[in-house]
A protein has these predicted regions:
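The C-terminal output helix
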Residues: 1-13
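Short helix/strand-capping hinge loops at secondary-structure junctions
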Residues: 42-47, 75-76, 96, 125-126
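Residues within the helices of the helix-turn-helix
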Residues: 51, 77, 100, 116, ...
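Residues within helix-turn-helix
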Residues: 51, 62, 98-101, 111-112
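Residues within the alpha-helical elements of helix-turn-helix
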Residues: 56, 105-106, 121
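Short hydrophobic/aromatic patch on the recognition helix
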Residues: 63-68, 113-114, 118
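Terminal helix-turn-helix DNA-binding modules in bacterial transcription factors
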Residues: 70-109, 131-135
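…primarily DNA-binding HTH/wHTH and HhH modules…
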Residues: 116-135
């Protein structure tokens, strides 16, 4: 695997690795920074959509899809879910909120679905992460 692919995989599979670790061109870096800021400020909205993100980025949904796929290898919905799960891992580390509260804070309507997505993404449940299983 190429170094870029290894870094991308590490970002996707590790709960606390931030997207800033990925290497981009200056244009892509600015694009990702703006998108990440928008996601962070709107994360609680369970109905945040690809169309919302595309509108914020002044592009069509299909162009957003192509752009993200080219930069990080994920579509916008996958990237949004990953950003939500990574934010959840940060909140879990703070030990201030329950898993249910965190699931709602990051935009999941169902704590059960949140736990399922967390395990699928990182290989451990939120409870296991709290017990020291996270990176």
């Amino acid at each position: 695997l190429s170094n870029r692919e290894l870094v991308r995989r590490h970002f996707l599979e590790s709960p606390l690795v931030k997207s800033e670790t990925l290497t981009y061109s200056k244009t892509d870096e600015d694009f990702m920074r703006k998108l990440d800021e928008y996601i962070m400020h709107n994360m609680e909205q369970a109905d945040l959509s690809v169309d919302d993100m595309a509108d914020e980025m002044c592009m069509s949904s299909s162009n957003l899809f192509r752009k993200l796929k080219g930069i990080i290898g994920k579509n916008p919905n996958e990237y949004l879910r990953i950003k939500r799960l990574k934010r959840a891992a940060e909140l879990l580390q703070q030990d201030k909120y329950s898993i249910t509260d965190i699931s709602l804070l990051v935009g999941f309507r169902s704590p059960t679905y949140f736990s399922s997505c967390f395990k699928k993404q990182f290989g451990i449940t939120p409870t296991e992460f709290l017990e020291g299983g996270g990176d």
